[in-house]
């Protein structure tokens, strides 16, 4: 969903209109994934680097997220979509955290489509969080430094239980 604001600006529209159109693209993409039998889909929604945007744009993005969850959650659940949010919870408003938790809980047993939404996500942040969890395991003695392999490191990522993309 990166580039929605630039897309809108390039057409003389407000940036928020690009983000609104991005939400519509998400709806179409999820529908198509379900129709095609796609089992796993990951969408990047809000980067942890997006906090540097103007406050009004951040406000608009969060308002769109709230509206999307409130409007679409029941249909996603009805269609068997399992929702999972990856990224850090730090800095998110309490109502956003509740929406995330409610969506995750409601859809936890669904299996038609595993929809992972990277929200307040950044690759560097994920690597730092994985390294921190590994350091904790080493400090507790449950993992030795010699046990840290690329595969082991990957098992500490937010997406460790997702299939590795093959295309």
Regions of interest found by a model, annotated:
Residues 1-167:
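Flexible, compositionally biased loop and terminal segments
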